[in-house]
Amino acid sequence: MACSAEAVFAELHALSNFSFLRGASHPKELVAEAARLGYAALALTDECSLAGVVRAHAEAKTLGFKLIIGSEFRLEDGPKLVLLAMDRRGYGQLAAFITLGRRAAEKGEYRLLRGQLETHPLDQCIAIWLPEDAPDDETGAWLARLFPARCWIGVELFLSGGDGLRLSVLQALGERLGLPLVACNDVHMHARERQPLQDTLTAIRLGRPLAELGYALFPNGERHLRPIEFLARIYPRALLEESLRIAERCRFSLDELRYEYPAELVPDGYTAIAWLRELTRQGMAERWPEGAPDKVRRQVEHELELIGAMAYEPFFLTVHDVVRFARSRGILCQGRGSAANSAVCYCLGITEVDPARLDLLFERFISRERNEPPDIDVDFEHERREEVIQYIYRKYGRHRAALAASLITYRVRSAVRDVARALGFSPSRIDTLARVLDRHGVAETLPERLAEAGLASENPAVRRLLALMQMLVGFPRHLSQHVGGFVIAAEDLSHWVPVENAAMPERTVIQWDKDDLESLGLLKVDVLSLGMLTAIRKALAYVGEGRGRPFTLADVPPEDPAVYEMLQRADSIGVFQVESRAQMSMLPRLRPQSYYDLVIQIAIVRPGPIQGDMVHPYLTRRAGLEPVSYPSPAVEKVLKRTLGVPIFQEQVMQLAMVAAGFTPGEADRLRRAMAAWHRKGGLEPFEKKLMDGMRERGYEERFARQIYRQIRGFGEYGFPESHSASFALLAYVSAWLKCHHPAAFACALLNSQPMGFYGPSQLIQDARRHGVEVRPIDVNHSDWDCTLEPTEIPNPLSLWERVGVRALQTGSNPALRLGLRLVNGFSSAAAQRLSDARRQGPFQSIQDLATRVPLDRRELEALAAADALHGLGGHRHRAFWEAAGVEAPTPLYAEPQFAEAEPLLRKPGEAEDVIADYAAAGASLRRHPLSLLRERLDRRGFRTAEALWQVRNGAIARVAGLVVCRQRPMTANGTTFVTIEDETGQINLIVWPATAQAQRRALLRAHLLAVSGTVQQEEGVLHLVAGRLEDIGKWLDGLVVKSRDFQ
């Protein structure tokens, strides 16, 4: 875009908050303010970064304003300068130069030298030299040679008292060197009001309190976008007009980026679309050996035609190649999300949702009208995803492949902590502040939280803290790596977007996140991780070894009634997607009986259907308590599978098309507006089109209003049917394993931690409730992983030799041996050394163990603390004493030379052992901690989880239990859901906001919680609405139980 004819100034040096902890304004704010002030253009020049340019570009396009792309640099052995891209080639040179500096340094840093500026091609970039107070001619002459007719001296004046002298010095310098001068302003914020925040960011960056910074702070607030009239009073007009000449030469826009996908996956003799068609044909033959249904063939042909027209075939070939590699290595993977709407993806083996089984909507995935790249999310086993990532790096090279960034922003807790430190609050006060703010702390409740920390909100220092914190929340803190979004290019990626090192070794990331990529319409491959895939693969292997033959996903029988009966009882701990408190509450009400019921089960326990008032109508119709009717056959076709209630995003899109006349592209825009309206609004234009379209087609006003109300309820929380269908497949397989092979399933879950909703303690308790014999950690039996052992030991040798899963033919109900991975402070490497030594024979004593296995004292004491030495040293106290006293052999003395008399050590009591088990291993096979307190609890009128079912609805009851998890869904209006556990089962608590507010400390901190509340029992679901909460952790002093909170 050309510069405005009326404007007389373009700002060429502006930093946003993507110059982390320097800039004090969002890119959008800078662009909007520059446009408001009448600037001709704005150059966003974050330090060695293009991380904020996409956001600035989007705002500039909206406002019809010119944005210049550039970056500020401080050469390690040279000057400070700004580089501006003149055209597409210059942009590529700039991005590559940023990459050069970032790849040479640790994450978050960069390193550039004068020599690199000389050798790196930058012939399509403009340089603005920003001299220090005493500029030297040599540097200027050097830059003038490097950038002939493209180098300026930047003059920056801030009313600091020496402006006149500085201007004259730089004018003389320019005359000597023949370099023109241009006005710049080193902008750090869009408005003066951000100066206090900019000072605070400086303190955070330097790690020192504001009061100690002195000259490290800017002397005044002049580094903001200032009115042109004001600039005309402090700069010679020629310097302002020079900025326009530079701006005119910078004609690049991010709209010029044209992304090209790798082409090497196409063999000779084929075009990309021909090869994709051939792979699809091969996959179709494998999926349907007897021939694909006509419906599927038509759908595949439609998809291939559209994929070819949109030139997306290289993207599909790349994802197919990644999936093919994973499967060749035995890594479980499965596509999900909107890609599961694609029959081509199913044929290619990317997704597992059979298009012949479900009526899916391809337009949810790819739309000609939308003309945006498709999004294919593929989940891989979380323990083996790195193999897939490194394969991508090897195949395409680090110069062509990198992960997308993830932008880490300030939240309330982190903002308060950093601001408080900058303001000089004491460490203890800062820790108190952080404790009283939970993860979902919101600014509106901060005064109350501060009062709880002993800080009055009317205190001036506290008011300052609050004001700065509220400005800082939402600011970018740093770039991290996306969970798995890969960007792969046909050529060098660094000419397209800067690439930098990630914190994790062997990883590189680009400087844009997924929203930036989507905004520019650029493709990424999502290589995601899923713990349940790891657990399923391990469980299938255990089952297969027990049966003496491989057992795969294809061997899991479909639609097993026993599986659905188990789920109807809400017996779903560990089962994928249906193990949460909310899902367990829904299972007895929905009573799934088929795969598609599971699809609905997963989707209906979501904020969208709940807020759209779709849950109750569906359940009453499913139970036969309410008739199902449809206003037309077209609507019936869309809603029949969900009994007339729209539950999925695809149904909303289909309704808009069949009932209101939307095109597929318009329906997809409606979906996107739904996803954003809570944050941005934007549904209103669709309301009129929906209402008018339905009226024109003869639908009643009441029906039209009901549909629109449900669409609003969906908001950003509507669940795609394709996504739910993908997850339902894994939910069924995990439920089948739990139902028929509980030992293998529990073993796999424990060996895949951390994952899922429950920790090891709850998984072990659940396995025992399902009849699994769980055996303790023991150095003579345990490996690193938990293992399966036969329940009938065939010979004495097996007492010490791990028989593992290969020996399970001797018993159909294997026992679960806990592994050394549960021992706090014990490493997998130490476990491997122990297992290797044990192959020579069982350990006879703790001294024998210490002699044969190179373990340090800390590792031995960790084993003793976890009671893993009970077979060698007797009870825990004695084993710990022996572990602390062992002597490692030396070259001179092969055996200990002195025997110390054994003291009389008291055997620990049962409660002491239980507490020690939890502390050292996070679980116990002894009596449940609550059973130790049961007599005391009974005297005080506490009921067990089992007895609570006998209490009538609406009655008051008292219960107590270990806290398993705490949840506060975003759409629950502040309600907290807590699950506690006693020796008979689990109890689900509902804590209303007022109760949570009044009793926050007990709610958020207690490991052992006593609750008095009202019983709520309906349709086979039981809750206790909490009235009073009490932390009774002192009843078992020292017991620490790790709960899974606010996941």
From Swiss-Prot:
Gene Ontology annotations for the cellular component aspect, listed alphabetically: cytoplasm
Top-rank lineage group of the source organism: Bacteria
EC number(s) stated in the UniProt entry for this protein: 2.7.7.7
Reactions mediated catalytically: DNA(n) + a 2'-deoxyribonucleoside 5'-triphosphate = DNA(n+1) + diphosphate
Alphabetical UniProt keywords: Cytoplasm, DNA damage, DNA repair, DNA replication, DNA-directed DNA polymerase, Nucleotidyltransferase, Transferase
Keyword Nucleotidyltransferase listed: yes
Subcellular location: Cytoplasm
Record-level GO BP terms: DNA repair; DNA replication
Record's keyword annotation contains Cytoplasm: yes
InterPro entries from the UniProt entry: DNA_pol3_alpha_NTPase_dom, DNA_pol3_alpha_thumb_dom, DNA_pol3_finger, DnaE2, DnaE2/DnaE/PolC, DNAPol_HHH, NA-bd_OB_tRNA, PHP_dom
Pfam families in the cross-refs: DNA_pol3_alpha, DNA_pol3_finger, HHH_6, PHP, tRNA_anti-codon
GO molecular function, one term: DNA-directed DNA polymerase activity
Location (main, coarse): cytoplasm
Family membership noted in the UniProt record: Belongs to the DNA polymerase type-C family. DnaE2 subfamily.
Reported function: DNA polymerase involved in damage-induced mutagenesis and translesion synthesis (TLS). It is not the major replicative DNA polymerase.
The name this protein goes by in its record: Error-prone DNA polymerase
Organism annotation: Methylococcus capsulatus (strain ATCC 33009 / NCIMB 11132 / Bath)
The organism's taxonomic lineage, starting at the top: Bacteria, Pseudomonadati, Pseudomonadota, Gammaproteobacteria, Methylococcales
Gene label: dnaE2
